[in-house]
A protein has these predicted regions:
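N-terminal secretory signal peptides
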Residues: 1-18
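N-terminal twin-arginine translocation
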Residues: 16-25, 33-47
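Gly/Ser-rich catalytic/binding loops embedded in alpha/beta enzyme cores
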Residues: 67-315, 414
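A short helix-breaking turn/cap at a secondary-structure junction
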Residues: 129-136, 331-409, 560-578
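Short helix-loop capping/hinge segments that flank enzyme active sites or metal/cofactor-binding pockets
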Residues: 131-143, 213-233, 391-400, 436-487, ...
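Glycine-rich, small-residue loops and helix-cap segments
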Residues: 160, 215, 255, 259-261, ...
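Acyltransferase
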Residues: 161, 166-169, 198-202, 386-387, ...
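Short glycine/serine-rich loop segments
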Residues: 245-369, 513-525, 530-539
Length: 578
């Protein structure tokens, strides 16, 4: 049992109990037989402070094992040496931001992806003139502006019908107004946002155009560091912390002229929608949470508070809340967007991605944020350009047969069939052991937050204390065994993508977060639910680095689905923020 959980109990913590916990961790690291034997050895050794032959014998009896005398002698000699080394190792304190030397590479199972990622996919073609045609509204009102896509807002900014200052002020006003119902805001950056908006207006007027995001407000999931602002990671332990660094993705968006207006909520340490201020809500039904952990990002975009936001995903944290809140979200290929300056959770699984209103919006944001960065050794430069169109005659779309087809997924398949897509039945490489591979995530997260766990300061961290406790018993051998199983899963997915180019649905969050494949959640269907009808999403998944195909196909489906005109009414009563 970890110190974190022991200290949460009402029983006093004695020196012998502390010794037992320490020894238990060390015997687990040593790999000394079963967990039962490790516990027994810890109990016996805590009594005298050293490991003896007699104590090993007693521990064998408790564990129901029999060791030879030679095994006992080896255990004593090697155990004492290793425990001394581990004491030295664990005495070194590391900040959560300290990187691991191990680098996850999604291409390792599919060497062809490395070359394929340097050029456009063969089914991509230059877009027709009307593919991203903009039809500005006849009247620009505060009621219509929150729901307009980025490309339309960009036209209004450049034709003098809108200023960035007005757009940013509207976003700030809406964030203030809706937050009591949604609990989606950690910090409003009013002063800096308005200053940046005025600068954007001046630059555009002078002909200095930074691109389509110039003057567009956005929100950051509060695990992105931004110098001079609170970066809380959703955890009470960090609720007043200010970091003096800025995440690479925020720096790139600033260079593109986008205006940061708010830090948005994340579930505590990137889990769920519960943070130290309460539970972030779904604008379509404020009786339920927004899901997470990109809780505030999805909620704020869904409610029309910001045109777009940046979220992150380790095991569903972009896809899940965007599906819950009925907005578009892109989880790019692992390594596509730098995580520099962001809270780490799992070095081998963390990904950043945009949440917005349309597929075109997502493409615009990805174009401004992707690419390698010295602060993230896993980040890479791979080809991406937007907009693109797909030649449907050359594209193979998979329909997953070994997963339940949800109504939104069937709607997407129906739209694809109607436009002549080549649909092929496939089966995902599922195994009962897939979930077990996520022990890698748990072990990495346990190490990132080792000091919190060791100190027992884990109050308000959702299920993390239990996960940290469990991860203490994951040996290095277990971690490496899981990594080998993960590679086999990656190889199976590489083989699958030799038969199709994309697939719809599949209930595959565990699989594709382990393999690093890109996925988009896309609103496609208006579904009757209580308290009001809501927009629901399907998912599309593509080969490594093929976000352009994902977005191009998503845009075709989006144009036929015609659900972007529906918005949540947000009529609930205010909630109490903690």
């Amino acid at each position: 049992m970890s110190a974190a959980l022991d200290q949460s109990s009402s029983a006093p913590v004695t020196p012998s109990a502390l010794a037992r916990r320490t020894l238990l961790r060390r015997f687990a690291a040593l790999g000394a037989g079963s967990v039962t034997l490790q516990r027994a050895l810890a109990d016996e050794t805590a009594k005298t402070g050293r490991l003896t032959d007699a104590q090993i014998s007693n521990a064998e009896w408790i564990a129901g094992l029999t060791l030879s005398q030679a095994d006992r002698e080896v255990l004593i000699r090697s155990g004492e040496s290793l425990l001394a080394e581990l004491q030295q190792l664990r005495a070194v304190k590391l900040e959560p931001a300290a990187l691991s030397c191990l680098r996850f590479d999604p291409e390792i199972a599919d060497p062809a992806a490395r070359e394929a990622g340097r050029t456009p996919a063969p089914w991509l073609v230059s877009p027709a003139a009307d593919f991203v045609r903009v039809e500005p509204p006849g009247e620009v009102t505060d009621e219509s502006l929150p729901w307009l896509p980025i490309r339309t807002l960009a036209v209004l900014l450049r034709t003098g019908r809108l200023t960035s200052e007005r757009l940013v002020q509207l976003s700030l006003t809406r964030l203030k107004s809706a937050d009591p119902q949604l609990l989606c805001v950690v910090s409003l950056l009013e002063e800096s946002a308005l200053a940046a908006a005025r600068q954007a207006d001046a630059e555009l007027k002078a002909g200095h155009d930074r691109g389509l995001l110039h003057g567009i407000p956005w929100g950051a999931k509060d695990l992105l560091a931004v110098a001079g602002t609170k970066t809380t990671w959703g955890a009470p332990q960090y609720r007043d912390r200010v970091l003096e660094q800025t995440a690479t993705v925020a720096t790139r968006l600033a260079a593109a002229g986008a205006v940061l207006v708010a830090k948005l909520t994340t579930g505590a340490l990137a889990m769920g929608d519960q943070w130290f201020g309460g539970k972030t809500r779904n604008p379509w039904n404020t009786e339920e949470g927004s899901s997470g952990s990109s809780a505030g990002s999805a909620s704020a975009v869904s409610a029309g508070l910001v045109p777009f936001a940046i979220g992150s995903e380790t095991l569903g944290s972009i896809v899940s809340p965007t599906k819950r809140c009925g907005v578009a979200g892109l989880r790019p290929t692992f390594g596509r967007i730098s995580r520099g300056g962001c809270m780490p959770l799992s070095w081998s699984m963390d990904k950043l991605g945009p949440i917005a209103r349309t597929a075109d919006d997502l493409g615009i944001i990805l174009a401004a944020t992707h690419g390698s960065d010295s602060l993230d050794p896993c980040s890479v430069d791979r080809w991406f350009a937007w907009p693109q169109q797909v030649d449907l005659s050359r594209l193979r779309v998979g329909r997953v047969r070994n997963a339940k087809v949800q109504p939104a997924e069937q709607a997407a398949l129906d739209h694809l069939q109607a436009i002549g897509a080549n649909i092929i039945d496939i089966e995902l490489p599922r195994s009962d052991s897939d979930d077990a591979i996520t022990v890698m995530l748990e072990a990495e997260a346990c190490e990132v937050f080792r000091e919190l766990s060791d100190a027992g300061t884990t109050e308000g961290l959702n299920a993390w204390p239990r996960i940290f406790q469990k991860a203490r018993f994951v040996s290095a051998a277990d971690y490496l065994h899981a990594s080998r199983m993960r590679l086999q899963l990656m190889q199976k997915m590489a083989a699958l993508f030799r038969t199709v180019d994309l697939y719809v649905g599949g209930d595959d969050l565990v699989i594709t977060n382990l393999t690093g494949h890109p996925c988009i959640a896309l609103p496609v269907l208006l579904q009757e639910q209580q308290p009001e009808p809501r927009v629901v999403c399907c998912t599309l998944t593509a080969g490594l680095y093929d976000e352009a195909s994902l977005l191009a196909l998503a845009k075709l489906i989006e144009s036929r689905a015609d659900v972007l005109k529906y918005h949540p009414s947000l009529k609930s009563a205010p909630l109490e923020k903690k």
